Amino acid sequence: SQYTGQSFYQYIEKGGYPFITISVNPNSAWSADYNDEGLEFLANKLKAAAITYKDKPIFVFSHSPSKRTPWGAKWGYDKMDKILKEYPQVIHFTGHTHYTIEDERSIWQNEYTWINVGPSHYANISTDITPDYEYPDSGKKITEAVIVDIEENTDIKVNRLDTYNEKELKTPWLIKAPHNGSQFKYFGDMQTRTDKDASPVMNGTPQVTDITEYGCNITFNQGEDDSFIWHYKVEAIDTRTQEIKYTRLVLSDFYWRNGTPETLSCPVSGLTPDTEYKISIKGVDSFFSESQPVESTTFKTNALPPVDPSVKAPKADLVDIVFTNTEAQNVAASGLAVTKKGTGTPIGYNTDLKMYVIKPNTTGSISNYYMVDYKGNTTYTNGVKNGFTYEVYCKTSDIKTMQYPLSNLQSAGMGFTFNETYTDPKGATFSAMIRGDGKYHKLNFMKATDVKANTYYHLLFTWNGEQICLYLDGEFVASDVCKKLTMPSGDAQYICIGADSNSSPSSAAQNAFKGEVAIARVYSKAVNASEVASLYKQLTTRSTIAEFTTLNSLLTSGSLSQELATEGWALMNNIATSKEELDAFITKVNSK
């Protein structure tokens, strides 16, 4: 108000009609919501205007829309709507979203009329279609306005203008008298509105190029519509099962109007190697009407290179947790320490795996677990920023509860989850999650129907700066494109073994794991398929070496000298220790 000389809240009577302006909370630098003073002013002036100007529209102007609007509700608020809905004669004009008025969702009538007035400086694109926020910058070339005419019979005509190109947009909106809600035209769901137009029409055959093991690129012709196509639904279909294996939405670029491109291209990802697919594309308009699909010719993704059995298993250089009968240690070269929170978790020797494991068992605990705090450790943060591998060997005794065996997923980061209930795809199964591209990527290791309680699974996922790959028990199972990694900040920079991290190590952890964890590792590179196979082979080979159990008896008997105990624990904690090395050590002990 100090710049305009105007008050924050105004009631204006002009030409025989009432006008009310409400500013957002003047005491908040960031919120676009309304304060109690403004809402009280609105309620009082609406009540007075409804009496003084009976049977006439009441014009209300404010910055932010309601959460109930069909276009930009994400940026809306609830408080004003509760007042306006008592007055069907209200016509509420708002901005805030920067969404185009060319879209018919910019007018909506329910208990009152709402109108989005469009962008005056630059345009935004709905994040319903671009959740990664990678929509193009409008470059100040999409600017709009409305001119409102009041007819002699009090009908309201709203003329839509493209102010950058100095021309009208589409046909005007008409709000007919009487203004008591009986003449609402733009009401209900978009699919059932009376102004709904015909469905889009697609043509041409989509072209598939740049085929890889996990995806391809697709180019297709833009479709046709009475108004415009809002977006396209791109689906990759497995031709053998007819299952949809991948779906993405692609914005049509309609907002460029005369400069809209004739063709669009997009990547398709998350496909299975050596599998036949076809691509199906449908056009979708603002009323959510879908066209008939156009389909590509079938194509086959590339096969993975054969696993090389001569490739050695890599060593985890950032985090490599091993357990003794009393503690957890990080034997990776990074030097990051493992910290026991509370009492940690019970540790015991697993006679099937032939190694020590932590045993959260059937209850788990958000107070007792192990953690690796990497805040301020550039070896770790630089190590994962361009690519990494997360690895865990675990089993759960509870195949219903949400739980995390190895995780750093507080607001960002990556980790393993089981039955995580907030993010699609949902289901009682093990998943890998990575925060990147403005969203959580979540990929399942197996179907929920395939998960067995008290069964060990070797779970591993990699990210190479562009692609996430999942491996289950040494074999590839799934992939997805991820171009940008988002890591936790501040005190949330720590990894939990047996739970998920929180905002700070001083807070209780989250979603305690209910089962056992034998291996917890992080690498500063994306290991390849041959290395994954070798890592899993190490585990299965170890489980067949009975001499580890003999070694454990010697280590826990208390009969070994300090020198022999140190040597023995080094053998126990090395996943690659061979039967021959154990035989030699046992012979050495027995000869003393």
Indicate where each model-derived feature is located.
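Extended active-site neighborhood of metal-dependent phosphoesterases/phosphodiesterases
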Residues: 1-43, 47, 53, 79-89, ...
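Binuclear metal-dependent phosphoesterase catalytic core
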Residues: 101-201
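Localized edge beta-strand/strand-to-loop motifs within extracellular or lumenal beta-rich domains
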Residues: 150-153, 455-469
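Extracytoplasmic low-complexity segments
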Residues: 302-365, 533-549
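Extended recognition patches within non-cytosolic domains
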Residues: 307-316, 516-557, 563-564, 571
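Extracellular glycan-recognition modules
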Residues: 314-318, 325-330, 364-431, 467-468, ...
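Short, aromatic/His-centered strand-loop micro-motif at the edge of beta-sheets
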Residues: 433-458
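Flexible glycan-contacting loops in extracellular carbohydrate-active proteins
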Residues: 480-516
